[in-house]
Swiss-Prot record:
Pfam families: M20_dimer, Peptidase_M20. GO terms for molecular function: acetylornithine deacetylase activity; cobalt ion binding; succinyl-diaminopimelate desuccinylase activity; zinc ion binding. Homodimer. Keywords: Amino-acid biosynthesis, Cobalt, Diaminopimelate biosynthesis, Hydrolase, Lysine biosynthesis, Metal-binding, Zinc. This is Succinyl-diaminopimelate desuccinylase. It is an enzyme of class 3 (hydrolase). Its cofactor is Zn(2+); Co(2+). Its EC number is 3.5.1.18.
Amino acid sequence: MTGALTPASTPALTLARDLIRAPSVTPDDGGAIGVLTAALRGLGFDVTDLPFGEGPARTPNLFARLGRSGPHLCFAGHTDVVPPGDGGWTSGPFEAALRDGCLYGRGACDMKGGIAAFVGAVARILESGRTLRGSVSLLITGDEEGPATFGTVKVLEWMAAHGQVPDFCVVGEPTNPDHLGDVIKIGRRGSLNARIVVPGIQGHVAYPHRADNPVHRLLAILSDLTARPLDQGTEWFEPSSLQVTTVDVGNEATNVIPGRATARLNIRFNDLHTGQGLADWIRGVAHVHAPGAEVTVQISGEAFRTEPTPELDMLAASIQAVTGRAPRLDTGGGTSDARFISRYCPVAEFGLVGASMHKVDEHVPVADLLALTDIYAAFLERLMG
């Protein structure tokens, strides 16, 4: 279907460029939500602005729905982007330049391009005069690259309270490592951050009996935590990973025993564990070696996996029909807002190729953007045609 269209004539490319031109570096919106709202209302969507947060600078979010019957398919994404960095861009990061068959700009693949492709798919179906059996919605946040406190989590709570929970959700994150059609994400590992502070008694290194060295106790804790693998992985998940990220004593003197020692670590864990179970384990190990240790744990998300569904099969079939690739079902990589959505409905993630995301000269081939539009349109037609 893309062969009959010039890139300049496609709603997906036009919207992608408009979104990139909105400098929505988290936590600033830069007008991106407004750009998307106008596009959706132009297609007949009912759009609800959902700002959440404290004070005047609240996080912009939106929920938009077209139709009221079932099945209800939701597309989820984010308009905020990471900072472009200090320089090195061939063209401006918010210029949305077209060059050598690619669209350049911060957010091109992560994930303004994915949002534009889905909206473009809906626009194509509506412009053809076809009707969709059911309803289509979008959950869009301006708070995914940041703390994610007042974004998707809050919108989902609002959706549940207003009878808007979908039957299935697609998140448009750039899931493909190399080629469009490589991977559908059907789950994610959980993530836990921990801070361990071991108190001691400061003193001169020549008189250790008058001091209590917290570094030795901290090393014993870290040695115990890393002594053996957490697990061997499962059918769908790679082995859980514990990585020590910082060790700090705040002491550059060579003749002083420090008064305290601090370490931070991260665990990416599979569905053999829960965040609370790992937190209890860390605290238990710490208190064996240092009864006075202070352990602070933040659980960013639990591991989850979407079981096979007809919608997942339809998405995979649509991808293969357009790209010729049978997508691999995968759970690797970092966390995403799918971890929140999985509490409400089955969710899968599929978007553009992510090789350049968060990098200087982030870009997406225009051919990939148009092909993703084809995939989303084919999926909508299979599910709701």
